[in-house]
Each structure stands twice: as structure tokens, then as C-alpha cells.
């Protein structure tokens, strides 16, 4: 009887050769590229006169540097315009599909590939972006790579990799009202630490994972990297197949039925052996907020910033540094901390279900005075779907700005930035110093619903308090 994990199965299927030193040459089934990490890679190919080995397995989009208020060309930022023009030229020269601005398919790379059906179970997926682990939600093995590796994949459609150990993260129970996948992964990272996953792939499993939507699973896998893991994944199941069916690049007809049968066989076997296992109880998890300068410095919204002496000795120096940087006092409640900017979007939480969760909180309310709040859909498809359901109107009426798709304030590569000592409530994935623009800017990570609650109240707020006062509505058009 087979006794392998999904990771073992996908690894073995893509192994090209065993290399000296213990690494493996691994075939890459899907290579996703964007405007930031691809120019140098293409330049290296041109210098050596090399073609792109498998242009049909390479798909490009533009996301990091695009402005979200107006995407009229040429961009005001000449460097951003040059980067996009270079990507357009490289894709045209090498025969690579580009999901460009206005194509109906543009967006954040980790949003568009799943929604187009490009990401499928059993694949190996590589991209020059840290959060490529997102695609593991489909039962793929997906990993971020550097620019030199982007070059290698373009040239050979393969990579030299070391096999990872596998840690299964089993989650029992069900998440409570107002608690989302973002809260679950922040809780996991808080509990295990930001370095616990080094050398591991994380398999997310258990009753709480089984009932998550694909978009929630993507949030979970997206932030596995923040816990130190190289990749995270969920075994493919009926939820996966229902999401993929009918998507542009998904198989059809008899090929679909064959694909589903094969995909089903990839799930980790009941007697699979894991290198490590940890368990969590979903019912015990509350809405989370980061208070510090790493994603591991998170607490439940009804908790307080930890006192220094309550921490392990190795955690104390960075906790002291974080409190100084964030202007927070050890022992103070996180709920009630004032915010300046509220950002809903990113490859972590810029999908339709994320926007719906935030809109449910915003509907019938208004952004607090002095708060800048804006919503950036993760893709053109997400934007159009949200607009069809009236979400843009809900947000605008509540005082939020409704923007064009892009990475936006997740990182400081476009005009959406914090200024000075501003503090943001953000649905993105990293709260490092200066991550969102200003070298002195501060970031509080939380779910989209929690960001919406902060925007309405002007401070960190337990979203469950607003949910209890929300009248259910079947339509955002009402």
C-alpha cells in the first residue's frame, strides 16, 4: 500500500535527475513571472543567446509596480513604465502569454493564476516572488525563487532543489464567527514561530481545513512562508475540483474526468509518515492582530501586548525593539490602538470572498473621520465580479476608495505608501519595518473584516462586536 505524502508524490513525479551533493533537478510545470524579478533573467538569456525552453509553460502579468488610482500609460513613474515596457517586449520576443493591463486577466500573479485555472493539483509551480506558496492550496508544490533561478527556469524549465521535510499542521474543530483563514495562519505562526518551518513543507489538514473555501486555503498557504516554510499545501478534494471546473485553462470533457481521478490520487495517504505533526483547535482561535515587526508577533484582538518578562529569553530583544518601533507599551491592550490608514487587498487577501467579508462590515456604516481607507481588488476579474455584486458601491458609500488591481500597499514599489509615522491596519502579509513605504511607517496585520472594522472605528476593534450589530443582507445592491 502506498504510504506517501502529497509532497513525496509530486516531488517524485517531477524529479529529472539526482545531482551531486544530494540536490535534485526538478521539472517546473508552471512558471509565473512579473515585471520585477524577470528583466535581469531575460537579459542573461539574451547575453548567452538562449531561448526560453518552454514558453507555453510560462505566464506573465504586471502587478508590483502598477498604480491603483489611474493606470493610464505612460505611468508617471518612469522606472515603473520602463519595467512594464520591458516585460511587454520580453513576452512578445519569446512568445510568452502576458496578462496585461486591460486584458481582463491582469492582476496579482498569485490571484490570476488560480482564477484562470493555470494552477492545478500535482503541479510544481515556481515564481520570482516569496508568496508563491499560495498555489499549494490546490495540492501543488509551489515555491518562490530568486532572479538567478528565474533565469534557470526560463532556460531549462527545471531547478536544482533540496527535498524538504514535511510537517502536518492538523486543525480540529471549526473557526468561529468573525474568524477567518488569516487569523488561523497568524495564530499558527505566532505559536510555532517565524523560523519553525525552515527546511519544511507545511501540509494543512483536518476538519477545519476541509471546510475552508479555496480562497481561504490560498490565504493559509500564502503565509506559510512567513512561518519559515518553503511551501505550504492542502490536499486536493471536492472543494478544489469545484473551484477549477470551467476555468479557462482547466481540462474539459473526458480530460476533466481523467484529471479529477488523477488529482484525487495525489492526496497524502492515510498511513503517510510525516517528519513532524502539530495540532490546533480552530474553535479556540480569535481574530488576530500583529503588534510587532514580524508576522510571528501576533496576538488575539482581546489580548495585550506581551510583557517582556513573559517571553522566552531569545524573544525579548526583538520584542523590545518592536515595542519601541511601534510605539506600544508592553502589557497594553491591542484593541483601541488608533490607526491612520486601512488597506484591504494583496495576494493574501485581495480575492472576492475577502472583499465580501469586509463589505459586510462596511455596509451601512462609514469610515471614521481622518482615516484613509481603500480597497484594491487582486485582479481585473475580482474587480468586475465585485462590481457586479455591488461591493464597490458599498465601499464607496462607506467612505472607502475603490481602486484598480495591483499589489498596492503590500510593499513600497508603487505610489501607495505610508508617510512618516503613519500606522496601517492592513490585510497584507508582512509587517517589517518600512515594508509599506515610509522607513518609519508601522503595520498591523489582520483579516479584511478586521481592517474594515478598524476603518469604521478609527482604531483596532474586535470585528465580532460589529458583527453582532450587523443586520444580515442577501445582496450588496440593497
Curated annotation (Swiss-Prot):
Q: What GO molecular function annotation could you give as one example from this UniProt entry?
A: metal ion binding
Sorted alphabetically, which keywords does the UniProt record give?
Answer: 4Fe-4S, Amino-acid biosynthesis, Branched-chain amino acid biosynthesis, Iron, Iron-sulfur, Leucine biosynthesis, Lyase, Metal-binding
Enzyme kind, highest EC tier: lyase
Q: Name one GO biological process term.
A: L-leucine biosynthetic process
- The EC number(s) this enzyme carries: 4.2.1.33
Q: Where does [4Fe-4S] cluster bind?
A: 347, 407, 410
Q: Which domain of life is it from?
A: Bacteria
Q: Which reaction does it catalyse?
A: (2R,3S)-3-isopropylmalate = (2S)-2-isopropylmalate
Write out the pathway annotation from the protein's UniProt entry.
Answer: Amino-acid biosynthesis; L-leucine biosynthesis; L-leucine from 3-methyl-2-oxobutanoate: step 2/4
Essential cofactor(s): [4Fe-4S] cluster
The record's free-text note on cofactor binding: Binds 1 [4Fe-4S] cluster per subunit.
Quaternary arrangement and interactors, per the entry?
Answer: Heterodimer of LeuC and LeuD.
Its biological purpose is as follows: Catalyzes the isomerization between 2-isopropylmalate and 3-isopropylmalate, via the formation of 2-isopropylmaleate.
Q: Which HAMAP family match?
A: LeuC_type1
User: Would you identify the family this protein belongs to, as annotated?
Assistant: Belongs to the aconitase/IPM isomerase family. LeuC type 1 subfamily.
Q: What is this protein called?
A: 3-isopropylmalate dehydratase large subunit
Q: Which organism is it from?
A: Prochlorococcus marinus (strain MIT 9303)
Amino acid at each position: 500500500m502506498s504510504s506517501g505524502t502529497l509532497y513525496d508524490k509530486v516531488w517524485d513525479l517531477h524529479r529529472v535527475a539526482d545531482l551531486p551533493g544530494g540536490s535534485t533537478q526538478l521539472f517546473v510545470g508552471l512558471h509565473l513571472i512579473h515585471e520585477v524579478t524577470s528583466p535581469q533573467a531575460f537579459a542573461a538569456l539574451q547575453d548567452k543567446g538562449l531561448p526560453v525552453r518552454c514558453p507555453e509553460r510560462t505566464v506573465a502579468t504586471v502587478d508590483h509596480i502598477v498604480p491603483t488610482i489611474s493606470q493610464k500609460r505612460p505611468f508617471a513613474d518612469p522606472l515603473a513604465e520602463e519595467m512594464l515596457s520591458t516585460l511587454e517586449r520580453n513576452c512578445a520576443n519569446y512568445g510568452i502569454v502576458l496578462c496585461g493591463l486591460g486584458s481582463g486577466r491582469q492582476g496579482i500573479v498569485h490571484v490570476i493564476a488560480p482564477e484562470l485555472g493555470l494552477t492545478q493539483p500535482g503541479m510544481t509551480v515556481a515564481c520570482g516572488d516569496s508568496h508563491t506558496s499560495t498555489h499549494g492550496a490546490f495540492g501543488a508544490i509551489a515555491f518562490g525563487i530568486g532572479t538567478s533561478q528565474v533565469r534557470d527556469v526560463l532556460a531549462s524549465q527545471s531547478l536544482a532543489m533540496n527535498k524538504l521535510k514535511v510537517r502536518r499542521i492538523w486543525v480540529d474543530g471549526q473557526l468561529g464567527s468573525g474568524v477567518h483563514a488569516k487569523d488561523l495562519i497568524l495564530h499558527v505562526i505566532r505559536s510555532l514561530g517565524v523560523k519553525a518551518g525552515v527546511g519544511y513543507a507545511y501540509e494543512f489538514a483536518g476538519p477545519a481545513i476541509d471546510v475552508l473555501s479555496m480562497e481561504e486555503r490560498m490565504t493559509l498557504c500564502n503565509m506559510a512562508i512567513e512561518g519559515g516554510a518553503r511551501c505550504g499545501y492542502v490536499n486536493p478534494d471536492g472543494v478544489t475540483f469545484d473551484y477549477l471546473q470551467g476555468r479557462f485553462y482547466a481540462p474539459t470533457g473526458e480530460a476533466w474526468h481523467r484529471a479529477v481521478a488523477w488529482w484525487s490520487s495525489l492526496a497524502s495517504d492515510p498511513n503517510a509518515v510525516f517528519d513532524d505533526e502539530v495540532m490546533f483547535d480552530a474553535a479556540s482561535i480569535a481574530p488576530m492582530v500583529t503588534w510587532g515587526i514580524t508576522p510571528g508577533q501576533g496576538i488575539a484582538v482581546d489580548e495585550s501586548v506581551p510583557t517582556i518578562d513573559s517571553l522566552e529569553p531569545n524573544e525579548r530583544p526583538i520584542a523590545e525593539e518592536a515595542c519601541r518601533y511601534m510605539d506600544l507599551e508592553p502589557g497594553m491592550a491591542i484593541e483601541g490602538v488608533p490607526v491612520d490608514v486601512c488597506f484591504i487587498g494583496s495576494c493574501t487577501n485581495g480575492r472576492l470572498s475577502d472583499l465580501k467579508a469586509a463589505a459586510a462590515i462596511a455596509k451601512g456604516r462609514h469610515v471614521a473621520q481622518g482615516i484613509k481607507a481603500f480597497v484594491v481588488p487582486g485582479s481585473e476579474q475580482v474587480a468586475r465580479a465585485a462590481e457586479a455584486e455591488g461591493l464597490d458601491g458599498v465601499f464607496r458609500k462607506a467612505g472607502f476608495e475603490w481602486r484598480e488591481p495591483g499589489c498596492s500597499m503590500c510593499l513600497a514599489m508603487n505610489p501607495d505608501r505610508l508617510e512618516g509615522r503613519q500606522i496601517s491596519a492592513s490585510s497584507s502579509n508582512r509587517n517589517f519595518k518600512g515594508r509599506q513605504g515610509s522607513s518609519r511607517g508601522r503595520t498591523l496585520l489582520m483579516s479584511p473584516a478586521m481592517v474594515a472594522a478598524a476603518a469604521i472605528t478609527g482604531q483596532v476593534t474586535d470585528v465580532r462586536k460589529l458583527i453582532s450589530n450587523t443586520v444580515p443582507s442577501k445582496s450588496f445592491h440593497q
